[in-house]
Amino acid sequence: MKIVADENMPFVEALFGGLGDVVRVNGRSLSAKDLKDADVLLVRSVTKVNQTLLQDCQSLKFVGSATIGTDHIDQAYLKHRGIPFANAPGCNATGVGEYAFIAALELAQREQVNLKDKVIGIVGAGNTGMAAAKCFAAFGNKVLVCDPFKTQDMLYFPLVGLDELIQQADIISLHVPLSDNGPYKTWYLFDEARLESLTPNTWLFNCCRGEVIDNRALIEFKRRRDDIKLVLDVWQGEPHPMAELVPLTEFATPHIAGYSLEGKARGTFMLYQALATSLNLPVKASLQSLLPSHFVNQLGLASQTELTQGQLLSLARLVYDLRDDDKNFRQAFDKTNGFDQLRKNHTHRREFSALTLASSGGCEVNWLTKLGFSGVGR
């Protein structure tokens, strides 16, 4: 069996190597000729899977995408061909949620404000949005949620309209799928008019798709409204973001909010499980066996009181230091293939769960485990 996989997808050999021959390809430049005699295709969001790509590949038995979103997949065409498809909903949700929370922690420390005083507005109540909401709620923030596809009985957090959320929230974090049609389209959801409606000193985070914000309008808006703070992980026109926008952000990264080692492993493992089910094969590997131990095996908290905001940030930086990705992005985003190279070489980040905490003092670890850290109590 010939298994064609994106070169940036981790653990493919470990999981799929026993099922056939693995061939690695550049996902962004993948073409029909690369899929000759392919039985399995494993992609990420940079690959458009459609009739043009697959029309000459008659042996294909399975397509998998290690992503939450599926806007890059022509599922109708796959269904017409009778080709099973699987994606990995929720695989990187924890990573995205923790990214948004860490960005807020970093920015609060930089601005010397108390993050707990901020009202959080989550736009999009899917997997990533709820992961972010969970982090902020564990920290003690008031969280509001906007999602036209949800009803209040489906959510733990107050459900409000977008205009109300913009008026009430101090931090707005975007977690919607990209849609350019229908009554709830999200393409340019934040256009010039909506940007103008932001209240003074709002922090705006985009962790979903670049085109959810009109980036050209955002540049003009930000030049007039320096009180607005931006954290952008996604960009209109990727992999070539508008160069004028990058210096206007507080933190800028190359679409890696969900790029934790755990999230990457989870995505590949979910496709492995789906392929095994599709071909009626036994699942012989485990997710945990793929992950290395964190360089800090266990950390004792000796403090007699609750952690300060600064102490929590220091703890968070042990698993992910956002400043590193921000620095690397600013240095390389405008170089040839710089955006994609940063994504390809992004391997170091872990999730909070990689770090085990124990308390030997009065510091309570329960809320830290709700935040995502592993805990062993006292």
Swiss-Prot record:
UniProt pathway annotation: Cofactor biosynthesis; pyridoxine 5'-phosphate biosynthesis; pyridoxine 5'-phosphate from D-erythrose 4-phosphate: step 2/5
Keyword annotations: Cytoplasm, NAD, Oxidoreductase, Pyridoxine biosynthesis
Record Gene3D superfamilies: 3.30.1370.170, NAD(P)-binding Rossmann-like Domain
Enzyme kind, highest EC tier: oxidoreductase
Residues holding NAD(+): 147, 233, 258
One annotated Gene Ontology cellular component of this protein: cytoplasm
Pfam families: 2-Hacid_dh (PF00389), 2-Hacid_dh_C (PF02826), DUF3410 (PF11890)
EC number: 1.1.1.290
Subcellular location: Cytoplasm
One Gene Ontology biological process: pyridoxine biosynthetic process
Source domain of life: Bacteria
Residues noted as binding substrate in the record, renumbered to the chain: 45, 67, 259
Reaction(s) the record says it catalyses: 4-phospho-D-erythronate + NAD(+) = (R)-3-hydroxy-2-oxo-4-phosphooxybutanoate + NADH + H(+)
Residue numbers annotated as active site: 209, 238, 255
InterPro entries: D-iso_2-hydroxyacid_DH_PdxB, D-isomer_2_OHA_DH_cat_dom, D-isomer_DH_NAD-bd, Erythronate-4-P_DHase, Erythronate-4-P_DHase_dimer, NAD(P)-bd_dom_sf, PdxB_dimer_sf
Broad class of where this protein is predominantly found: cytoplasm
GO molecular function: 4-phosphoerythronate dehydrogenase activity; NAD binding; protein dimerization activity
Family per similarity comment: Belongs to the D-isomer specific 2-hydroxyacid dehydrogenase family. PdxB subfamily.
Subunit annotation: Homodimer.
Summary of the function given for this chain in its UniProt record: Catalyzes the oxidation of erythronate-4-phosphate to 3-hydroxy-2-oxo-4-phosphonooxybutanoate.
Full protein name: Erythronate-4-phosphate dehydrogenase
Organism: Shewanella denitrificans (strain OS217 / ATCC BAA-1090 / DSM 15013)
